[in-house]
Amino acid sequence: MLQRPPHRESFNDKEEIIDLPNLIEIQIKSYNQFLQADKFPDERENIGLQEVFTEIFPIKSYDEKTILEFLSYNLGVPKYNPEECIRRGITYNVTLKVKFRLTDETGIKEEEVYMGTIPVMTDKGTFIVNGAERVVVSQLHRSPGICFEQERHSRGNVIYSFRIIPYRGSWLEGAFDTNDLIHIYIDRKKRRRKILATTFIRALGYSSNSDIIEEFFTTRKYKIKNEKEFAKLVGKILAQDVVDEESGLVFGKASEKLTTAMLKRIVDAGIDVIRIAEDADETSPVIKMLAKDPTDSYESALKDFYRKIRPGEPATLSNARSAIMRLFFDPKRYNLGRVGRYKLNSKLGCEINDEKLQTVTLDKEDVIGALKYLIMLKSGSEEASIDDIDHLGNRRVRSVGELIQNQCRIGLARMEKIIRERMNLFDFSSDTLTPGKIVSAKGLSGVLKDFFGRSQLSQFMDQTNPIAELTHKRRLSSLGPGGLNRDRAGFEVRDVHTSHYGRICPIETPEGPNIGLISSLSSFAKINEFGFIETPYRIVREGVVTDEIEYMTADQEEQCVIAQASAPLDEYHMFAEPICWARYKGEQFETDTKNVTHMDVSPKQLVSIVTGLIPFLEHDDANRALMGSNMQRQGVPLLKPTAPIVGTGLEARAARDSGAVLIAHEDGVVDYVDGLKIVISPDDNRLEKRTYLLKKFIRSNAGTCINQRPLCHVGDKIKAGDVIADGPATDKGEVALGRNVLVAFMPWFGYNYEDAIIISEKLLREDYYTSLYIEEFELTARDTKLGKEEITRDIPNVSEETLRNLNDDGIIRIGAEVKPGDTLVGKITPKSETELAPEERLLRAIFGDKASDVKDASLIAPPGTEGVVMDVKVFSRRDRLSKTDDELVEEASKLKDIQREYKSNQAQLRTEKHERVGALLLNETAPGNIVHRRTAEIIVDEGDLITQDLIEALEKESVEDLLMPENDIYTTLRQILHDYEIALQTVETQYKTQLEFMRKGDTDLDPGVIRQVKVYVASKRKLQVGDKMAGRHGNKGVVSKIVPEADMPFLSTGQTIEIILNPLGVPSRMNMGQLFETHLGIAAKHTGITVKSPVFEGFPEEKIWEMMKKAGLPEDGKFFLYDGCSGERFDNSVVVGYIYMLKLSHLVADKIHARAVGPYSLVTQQPLGGKAQMGGQRFGEMEVWAAEAYGAAHLLQEMLTVKSDDVAGRTRIYESIVKGENLLKSGTPESFNVLIKEMQGLGLNVYTEAVDDS
């Protein structure tokens, strides 16, 4: 029978309303949208790579006679599979070919141009770059759009301001000053130039005062009939200039206050109609600004604007106009993005639809709207509010696709300049211009290479265990280009915000300088099309909680009253009580259930996946839960992993989505199983048998072992989606990072002082915490100036004993035991010949010593290496000239076999395609015309009966050349033809790769490398004193003593305790979850079941005591123990139970280090520091004080001179040791010389003088 995950008993059998989404969807979906590899070129949406090409192209030459247009792009198929790329140390990528159309004086030319390679994401959401798996972490950054802020001025009054942040381009800011005037700033960080808001509005096209007043105020026409009307208008603001049409005399300008005298002059002139700004007065900011404004027309405002942003340059009208166009109205230089436009319109209350979202530049209306809102804020209007920049409505996620898209944009923008230059410099008289001659592939592939290799967001994947891998892909970072700076980020940015609920985990974040800047997505969170994080809620209608799900962003959630998932419901899905706890605008309060609009889908939607794996999380202090979350990622995969007795129910899902386990793709029956592969016959007879290859003893990024073990047997019935093989740190398809061990919380001879852990020898004997490590050693033989390096067994001046494990080629045999200093691969390098002395030449001539012109450059096992050689891989180039006749004959025979296989595969694919197309179309009536794209010839007429001949005519054409209407039959036909072309491409790539390998060997080696050898050494690490262990509740400690099983305390049944923890580690740390887990663990173990205690809905205390009683155990969970040494009973009863403990990747064997001799620092001449540098321990300031306190003068002198940086003294002491003398004559420490040089560098004439001893 297939071993499925065991059923876990739960106290609360509430069904989940909604399944967890795919946990690595954030990576896969984003990259698929960027690449759109599965879509036909003409069906691709204008997003991702397609969008970048359409933005940059068409490119015109400076004289606009030559135009280069982008038509489509095509992606090849990968040369090797991901496993092979890791093995060879190369990048998993595909070729990118782009079809361009060039139009010039000679005509139109179309050509497909090779544009380099582009890395491809694996099924697990990772990239393989130079043989290492990497993850591109999603970035959390400030969303484009508009935000309104307030700050207190030094005088005490509040200053209001707004900021329009584009996706690309100049920032536009507006702020009140202390005189209630609004000034506009452009790129405030770069230059502090301020422009009066009305001047800026005029420069945008609102030329007159009346235009500006019309935008900001309600205006109305007044007829002056009598004295009463006359008196009513005094003190009002004019909305239009009052001009005598005949004489042209101006009686009052727009924005001026009407006085009695002015009105009298107007009436006397016979003018009886004037326009007034209804809601304006002298204190209004706009009226104040118009009074102060030095400009009065569009032209003067433009010039004034230009003088401010480009001081010192001549302010002509055309310059000014093009400057403002470039800054805000040119889509190539200024882009709000769809998200920026969405945020701007929603804040200013404008319409949001697809058409509006396409407007990516700034509008005049946007600036007017922002200024109006700012004035409303100043006036204290309830409709206007300040933005919280830490709210998730104002922060968005840039996922992998968007990050790479931005890099492609940079690469293509560089390429655009090169293309223009080439168009200009091309000599049309001597040659014909084609796209291939002006398009260079370097721009794009160079930028991508740089991004994957150097960017802060492209990270070497944490592959310690499946949970570490999964968490790394779901990580959100506020750091990186365009993000925050670790040193300048304040407390507010790092803090937990109410809008994080259900979106970002409040617990999982690193300790240290990155706290709060790096976080993790919550378990149910998704990212929407604008990059905002959404979380699901159940909709509540008239008090009834429906199963309808609505995903909401932090902004949308602000308008809703949301009940908790734990609120009790009756059988009709109505709230059981009239009052419940709910959230509104981030605040928790009790409310009437009638007001509730939504309800949480699950209590665990608050936390991330790894935090959701901690049982009884609700009983742990947040600081310890944080440590528990982080330490689960450091758990080492064990030799015999066991799933926890007390889980949370997320174990199986986490294992599945991490990619550690092997999953069946379709229903079927197991035909064959062994340690290397599983063969399944599908239930659908049309499909071939599917072979699943298992990963065997592969080295992970962290040096741990990746090994898959089959869970099924021959004859088992398999359903699609079943787990058919376990991976590292999984047990029957569930995550299993550690082991269940019998624990006692008690002190034991002081060995568990300060969180130390005592373990029984039984854990070592039964390999509870034994793990497998794999180290990789690499050696390359190159072609040097002096000759070729050679990998060989024939090494000068090396004993046969040293070479005993090397084969004839000089490479260590598989299975050999390795110790530090052993030769793994023998290599000799030519060394430069020096002129020999005559007598030396004579000796050489007599004895024929040829070995002296090469030196030994073998690969030696470094200190600390112990284990067994488990694999050796050799890669080499093949030179046709160096092959023997036999090798050439063998090669010819193999080439024939490869060609035969290639032709057979091609024929099989053609037959398969023919059968599928025949089954779909033969003797059917054509549902529409099928037309050839280039020749416009009709291949199939609508209404025709489709015959075998028509099918053969269709099959001859490429799917890209066929134009057919949208309907079910033709969509299926396109898919069949597309699948065939991809399969054919894959077969061709494999064929070419095999041919290349036969003729030239491994061509992927770096230039100059002839041969490369990789040796893999596996070592078994048992638990030892000094290793770090931890539970899931942040209860960490170091193994202090391994006690013989006979000496461990034991129960009355004779069962010995396996691990002893300090009871003082619980109360002050407030992680009571470990006690609940211990009690429930022993109850479940004695009942023979496994249990799940999901976060925030776990087993209550009463239920645990009930289970203890049922299992016949003491109700308080305390047992009397007996001393293993004396056999006497301890006085007090002790908490005993089963706890899940992990061994962490901080192993003492990797940390312990000693130095006898080794390298010294160049400047100070002191030994280097750290294990990697073979460094020493510093005898520091405090240690010197301690020695001084004892008056140990001779010891101190030795420590600070000859044992450290006294160069001459070091040599002398060495000589005296060799001669057997006991002399110490110390000189000057080098660090003293450094100090003198530094003082001399400051201009102080400091020097040492020799003093006469007498």
Curated annotation (Swiss-Prot):
Enzyme class: transferase
CDD domains linked: RNA_pol_B_RPB2
Superkingdom per UniProt: Bacteria
Catalytic activity: RNA(n) + a ribonucleoside 5'-triphosphate = RNA(n+1) + diphosphate
Listed GO MF terms: DNA binding; DNA-directed RNA polymerase activity; ribonucleoside binding
One GO process term, biological-process aspect: DNA-templated transcription
InterPro entries named in the record: DNA-dir_RNA_pol_bsu_external_1, DNA-dir_RNA_pol_su2, DNA-dir_RNAP_su2_dom, DNA-dir_RNAP_su2_hyb_sf, RNA_pol_bsu_bac, RNA_pol_bsu_CS, RNA_pol_bsu_protrusion, RNA_pol_Rpb2_2
Record's GO cellular component terms: DNA-directed RNA polymerase complex
EC number annotated for this UniProt entry: 2.7.7.6
Keywords annotated in UniProt: DNA-directed RNA polymerase, Nucleotidyltransferase, Transcription, Transferase
Gene3D superfamilies in the cross-refs: 2.40.50.100, 2.40.50.150, 3.90.1100.10, DNA-directed RNA polymerase, subunit 2, domain 6, RNA polymerase alpha subunit dimerisation domain
Protein family (similarity comment): Belongs to the RNA polymerase beta chain family.
Protein function: DNA-dependent RNA polymerase catalyzes the transcription of DNA into RNA using the four ribonucleoside triphosphates as substrates.
PANTHER family membership: DNA-DIRECTED RNA POLYMERASE I SUBUNIT 2
Subunit structure: The RNAP catalytic core consists of 2 alpha, 1 beta, 1 beta' and 1 omega subunit. When a sigma factor is associated with the core the holoenzyme is formed, which can initiate transcription.
Protein name: DNA-directed RNA polymerase subunit beta
